[in-house]
Amino acid sequence: MGRIKEKESKAPSLSESHTDYEYAATAATSSDDGFDEPNRVPVHKRKVQLTNGEAKKKKFKHADSNVKPPTLEEIKEIRDTRNLFHSNLFKLQVKEMLEEIQLKPKYSNYIETWIETFTITVQELKDGLLDTCELEVPLHLHKKSFNFQFLTPTSEPKLIGAAATGTLLGPKIVVDVALEMPAACFQHDDYRNLIYDQKRALYLATVASKIKQSPAFKADQFAYNYHANNPLKPVLELTPASKLGKYLLLRVYITAQSEIFKLSRFLPWTNNIRPSVFGDKWNEAETLPATQHYNANVLFDLTLAENQKLLLSTFTGRRNFQEGLLLLKVWLRQRQLDVGFSGFSAHILAAYIAYLKQQRLLHQSSSSYQIARTVWNQLANSDWTQGITLSQHQPHQLITLAGYYDVCFMDVTGYYNLCANLPLAVYKAVCAEAKLAVELLNDVKVNSFSHIFMQTSPLYTRMDNILKITNPASVDQLLQLHVQPHVKYDYANYAHPQLLKLLTDLLQKGLGQRVHAILPLEVPCSPWTVDTKAPVIGRSLTLGLILDPEHAHEVLDKGPATNEDANGAAEFRKFWGNKSNLRRFQDGSITEAVVWATATDAPSQKRLIVRQIVLYLLEHQLQLEPSEVQYIAGNLDVVYSLTPSFKVAKLQTKLKIQQETDAEALTPNVIHCYDALARQLHSLGDLPLDIVSISGISPVFRYCEPQPLLPQARLVSDRIHAGQVLRVIIQLGPSGKWPSDLGALRSLKTAFLIQIGQQLKEQHHLHWHLCKDGLLVLKQGYCFLLELAHSKELALLKQQQTERGVTTYVDNPASRELERRHYILPRVSGALHALHQMHGAFGPTVLIAKRWLAAQLLDDGLWPSIATELLVAHLFQQRQTPHTTVSPQTGFIRFLQLLAHSDWSGELFLLNFNNSWTEQQITDLEHSYRSERDSYPSLCLATAYDQQHAGRLWTSNNSPSKPVLGRVTLLARHALQLIESSLLSPKLAFVRPAQLFMASGDGYDLVIQLKPDLLSNTLCYDLGSPFLPFSQRNFRLPLAGCDQLAKVVQQLRDAYSEYAAFFYNPHGGKELAIVWRPASEFAPKPFKVNELQACTPCVGGKVQVDRDTLVEDFKLLLKDFYLRVCTPQELKREQREHNKPKRYFNGQGESEPDKPQKKKKKASTIPTNAKKRLMKSKSMNALC
């Protein structure tokens, strides 16, 4: 269910930056750690009568003991832990995190010194005209020419925001400073037509120009930036020249006094931007459109001082409130919902805390945890669409004000909407996250701390589909032809919110119940130097779509009936255009409808229905061609699709298989065949024992096999040839007649399998073949391997006799493997199959993840495939996001996030299938894991079916090892960087599959090229090798269950793992890459008879391991597979020289000197009849 993160608790310490007055003020209401003290109830203790000796002893002990009685603070902490938290661990984690994020005294001292210096410098500024400003004005608007004179500020600069409330949060500490413009800088009508914004920008540029010349700031870095990606809000960023500049940034805001303009001039229904500003004409008889969003932009400056007073009265001197806000800011930042023009900022959170305090939902003595929990609880059940207010005397009705905004949260003046730029979808997303946080806190089986505070969850990892519009011509087309004029005036012609409103309204109407939310994906604007012009931002749009799993893949959009709602039907036809048709349904109704797919389409095609709808709407409604936009959905599905090199037309099967199919679409065919075989096995009546159950344990039975399984298994010369073997476990009924000898029992099992095979042949005409692993059965082109399971075999494997002849039962590797394969894996396989039925994206996510790991040259010997399945299942089981993804591509990105940011040394991955584990069992396992960490593997996975083997069954210390885990972490981080940069950059297209699913050829010492005619190609879409170009295809079927290369590689690892590490791609790889161990393993060592493998004599009577000798040993083990050995550098040089490496069927081993070419012989002619006989040969068809 959850991941348990091991942490060490630190001793509580008091911050040295607090004054004695602060501690005295908080001691009466809250402890120093911010946790609440419940009301103390007098406890009446019963006196115990003591004997004289006991009394004297007790008195003496109290008199001489150095142990002090518990203080009130300690008693209060114990009570808090019991009343508020599930465990002491959660409280210690919260406490430790708060200690880590507290502002260090050196930063607070520097900020105090800086603000004093800045105040002195500002007061020394002299009045002057704009001509004295040598810097660029940080504004890109339709400017009006007017004279502007700089006047010295009449009030001192003030700290605002987190710096004023004591809630600064790193790692990059941003300190906001407000500098108020004098009232004399403005005239009566400056509130109209963007004049206020121009004067504000001119004033900022003049301040920057004059301060930059000051000796106190001359060494600092000066830059401009936009506050919250708002081009009307430029700020000055100063980075100190000292070492603190790496972690500290100071931003200067220009504000104005609230008295310069009447606040009533900025009511939402008033207009303050005339159409003539943008060269538009307007009919004077019509009412001017409201500019509520622009008005709110000006009110932000005018009301800043009043709102700051409220926040100071709420947070100053209250450490519990400050720490509560810090917890909320960490939670919000980890989800990246506070980014950009449309973000839910921390300022809104601080104001909401003040609102809850006004409503008496927060008490002054509330602990930091109680504050955060209360905020989450209230947010989860809130509805700001009707409006809430901080004002004690709201001048206008909230319902009227709320009609002009998506979300309404009025400030202390009652005029400024704190959420003016907040879209409804973002607000609902924050509420959903808050609801999830409360649910996690209430779940005692989950370590909610890591989920809420520690796990980074970027917003793009929650999106199922992503739409990007970055083409400048397309953006201009949308703004000029489709955006309404009143929207342009409302946002002062800022492109981003105009595009956002246009697209979200259209897509929300077209998609309806198919989407949960449509959210903007923004990136913070980058600063620019003060001597360059302000950049134009917002000329692109990236939208993320969170799909509804119940409705997203519906193939039909049904409209209103024509005879019941003629107007609605006409509007439906107009909206959908030619896609809409009149249809009759089975219930007899005749309505307009739009069909996007058929019910028999593959799941991967149905997942693209939303993509099809969006692209059609953009083309039909907005005249945007599909080539002009980027729609990111299903881009990575190609990695488990069938390679076009294999032609399904040559398959001899009754199944209808399309050429453009994939592993997911082919899996139901396998399962249907398996179900038919299971029914046939149950129908066998002449067996000595009953068949209790039949379970498929191969990955395909849980939709986790990335190789497309085609019905191509054949019988050739009484031997079954198949690309893959499907394992099936048969559980037999109880019987007391099984022998007590292990060898005899297994011989009896073999006889039982022979009898099953004979009956399958006689009754159902199925071919079978006996092998050492079980019974091979050929059915409908698929090969099944039947194994018999009986509990007595497991008991005999565990049976041991002591020296005294006592029989004991002890677990050993063989018994654990048998128990895992026969008893535990069938249950886990069934649970994973059920998980796929519940979440259709689970199986395809596993397919992509397995293909990615295989592409990094990690086979089952280095990274068990079942570990990938369980990790992905863990992602789908845990409630890390409010909505489970329906996109395998998003699931894969979350899988990469898990690999990139997991602490393998301290995390236990629990999969509590069907809630089979009790709370006590989970607690015991966690305790065992923390106390005996070294006894568990590096990657620790535990399922509810593992019994006493929990945590040690699916992985080992060598598979995967710590170096492999470290390499996978680095590879996942690099892959995430590629994905994130391509998703969020307006200039880049989404990453190509070949960039992710082809390993780098660097870092390897040797490459052993294998003969491609002996190795079958993968049926998956082949993205190439990191070492060599494509070779001739080879789709010959090997003997069933014969994977010689995997066995040889395992032999190499068993024999030479001390000296080298071996890597290859199990999905059709034709090369074996080798990395030598560190040089210390090859240093001279003393002569020992049992340590002479690959050694040669050297000086001093010592021996030394020789790499050349090891290579010869490798060749000997590889035998017929070996073609040649070379280095990656040699392969690159060959490719540069256009020399084809010998990866083809005509390869002749090691490269040899050039020889004179022999004369070509004429090809022998084969008679036509012989050719026909050869083509009709079943043996030839089976091997092709």
From Swiss-Prot:
One annotated GO biological process: ribosomal small subunit biogenesis
Keyword terms, alphabetized: Chromosome, Nucleus, RNA-binding
Region listing for Disordered, in residue ranges: 1-42, 1133-1184
Localization annotation: Nucleus, Nucleolus; Chromosome
Biased composition (Basic and acidic residues): 1-10
InterPro entries: NOL6/Upt22, Nrap_D1, Nrap_D2, Nrap_D3, Nrap_D4, Nrap_D5, Nrap_D6
Family recorded in the similarity comment: Belongs to the NRAP family.
Subunit structure: Part of the small subunit (SSU) processome, composed of more than 70 proteins and the RNA chaperone small nucleolar RNA (snoRNA) U3.
Protein name: Nucleolar protein 6
Species, as recorded: Drosophila virilis
